[in-house]
């Protein structure tokens, strides 16, 4: 079998096709033909362009970047025997995932076989890879993966943000799918819950877990606090939304020597506590003004014990939100009043604002408007007021993670029916989000997001050329744009060599 060998002559590097032959009991190389030479690290063919044919053009740029990020944190080694198939699914979820049965044809349009060993890829192999994920000890595996990320990126996380989302399933026979509170407010869909913890600064995922669709948000954190305790992180701040807060969660996190910063629902007890301070004219004084990004809050801070845990409670007034909520309700009430005058039915829930004859009741309306625009947050650490607000209200990094999971990585809708395949599908999406978050971190000093960078690299193809006359094959990456060079440099300058 022939191959290409380099020869140095007079300071230049030449390429020749040679083949091994056995002569006199020894293996010797026989010159077949001159191929070309190297100049500035590039191959210059001796053949005429008229003899060259384009054999194939493959998608290369996004996959090169994703595979580089995965290899840096030793993801292929950690995934074991089915790593090649699993990584192909992960990369597809980042770029252009549709379904398992579409994967073999999608693979043919990409240069994944240059990066992964996927010769003869079939849907059956991919299903086998999904099954292998279910055999993993997911909790221990996620911890080891995160430890590897911290080592490579030299991270010492001091803040964690936790949140829960749900997604629906097409199939109705999966035991995980249960009726629950759909965060998209669509009724009648079977749901699963996904809890996700990310680092507060970088947005790197620490852990995730899939729950039945009818599990309360606060209960999901109860299950995951024990897992979080095994990570051995130095004490920091655990941040989560008001739907997750509970006395047990506060105490469990405190036992780990971590502090809590969380939202708290404004129930009747808290309304009674805050009523002496909730007068907008009293609260909206200049010393109480705090800016968080484009939003203005007026705040009041008081010591408080929440389920026996000491901390400080902040009442936050968003005057703009108060005005919008109040005017939206009044529009609905006035429209309902006109419908009642015509003897027509009104929107459920608005009846309490009218008497039996359809006359408006000012008392219930004023009561409903009393705490419009107010929110409440609780913190067990003594933070400056502005920092307390910015840390809580700027926690959209986990919301961006969920948008990435649901949008870019195609978390929803889940088309699998078997519970183990649902777990595996979410796990694939979790790994895809991990790579996207690593990419976003590497691009933090550029104008690009992870999604826009992958889109820009989508025109970075590899062309396979064949010399029809001498049956010589060569691959070349198409010329890079300026933006593509910026992206590759931001990730790793060594990737620029991959274009040669």
Segments from the language model and where they lie:
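An anionic, glycine-rich sequence signature occurring as long contiguous blocks
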Residues: 192, 207-210, 256-391, 458-500
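Dynamic "connector" segments at or just before major functional cores
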Residues: 1-173, 188, 195-208, 214, ...
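Basic, amphipathic alpha-helical segments enriched in Lys/Arg and hydrophobic/aromatic residues
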Residues: 418-439
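Conserved nucleotidyltransferase catalytic core and NTase-mimicking acidic/glycine-rich helix/loop elements
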Residues: 432, 436-467
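Short, basic/hydrophobic alpha-helical segments
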Residues: 218-235
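Short amphipathic alpha-helical "interface-anchor" segments enriched in bulky aromatics
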Residues: 388-415
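Acidic, metal-coordinating catalytic cores used for nucleic-acid/nucleotide bond scission
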Residues: 239-248, 266-269, 420-423
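Short acidic, glycine/serine/threonine-rich loops at helix termini
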Residues: 169-176, 206-208, 248-252, 271-276, ...
């Amino acid at each position: 079998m022939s191959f290409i060998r380099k020869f140095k002559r007079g300071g230049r590097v030449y390429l020749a096709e040679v083949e091994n032959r056995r002569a006199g009991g020894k293996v010797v190389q026989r010159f077949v033909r001159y191929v070309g030479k190297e100049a500035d690290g590039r191959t210059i063919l001796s053949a005429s362009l008229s003899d060259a044919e384009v054999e194939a053009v493959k998608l290369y740029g996004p996959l090169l970047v994703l595979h580089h990020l995965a290899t840096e944190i030793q993801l292929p080694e950690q995934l074991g025997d089915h790593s090649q198939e699993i990584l192909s699914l992960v990369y597809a979820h980042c770029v252009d995932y549709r379904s398992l049965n579409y994967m073999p044809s999608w693979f043919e349009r990409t240069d994944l076989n240059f990066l992964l060993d996927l010769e003869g890829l079939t849907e059956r192999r991919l299903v086998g890879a999904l099954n292998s994920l279910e055999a993993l000890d997911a909790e221990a595996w996620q911890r080891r993966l995160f430890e590897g990320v911290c080592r490579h990126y030299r991270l010492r996380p001091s803040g964690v943000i936790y949140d829960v989302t749900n997604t629906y399933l097409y199939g109705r026979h999966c035991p995980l799918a249960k009726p629950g509170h759909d965060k998209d407010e669509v009724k009648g869909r079977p749901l699963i819950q996904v809890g996700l913890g990310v680092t507060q600064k970088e947005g790197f995922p620490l852990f995730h877990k899939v729950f039945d669709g009818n599990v309360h948000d606060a209960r999901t954190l109860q299950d995951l606090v024990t897992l979080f305790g095994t990570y051995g992180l130095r004490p920091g701040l655990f941040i989560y939304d008001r739907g997750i807060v509970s006395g047990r969660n506060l105490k469990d996190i405190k036992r780990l020597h971590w502090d809590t910063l969380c939202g708290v629902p404004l129930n009747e007890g808290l309304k009674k506590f805050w009523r002496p301070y909730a007068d907008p004219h009293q609260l909206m004084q200049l010393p109480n003004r705090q800016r968080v990004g484009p939003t203005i809050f007026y705040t009041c801070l008081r010591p408080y014990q929440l389920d026996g845990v000491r901390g400080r409670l902040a009442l936050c007034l968003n005057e703009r939100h108060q005005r919008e909520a109040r005017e939206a309700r009044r529009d609905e009430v006035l429209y309902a009043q006109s419908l009642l005058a015509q003897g027509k039915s009104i929107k459920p829930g608005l009846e309490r604002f009218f008497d039996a004859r359809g006359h408006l009741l000012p008392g219930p309306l004023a009561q409903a408007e009393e705490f419009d625009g107010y929110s409440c947050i609780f913190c067990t650490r003594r933070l400056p007021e502005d920092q307390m607000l910015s840390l809580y209200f700027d926690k959209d990094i986990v919301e961006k993670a969920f948008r990435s999971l649901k949008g870019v990585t195609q978390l929803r809708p889940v088309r699998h029916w078997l519970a183990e395949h649902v777990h595996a599908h979410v796990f694939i999406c979790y790994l895809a989000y991990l790579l996207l978050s690593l990419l976003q971190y590497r691009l933090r000093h550029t104008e690009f997001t992870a999604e826009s960078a992958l889109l820009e690299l989508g025109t970075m193809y590899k062309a396979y050329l064949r010399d029809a006359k001498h049956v010589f094959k060569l691959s070349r990456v198409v010329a890079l744009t300026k933006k593509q060079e910026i992206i590759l440099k931001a990730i790793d300058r060594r990737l620029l060599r991959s274009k040669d």
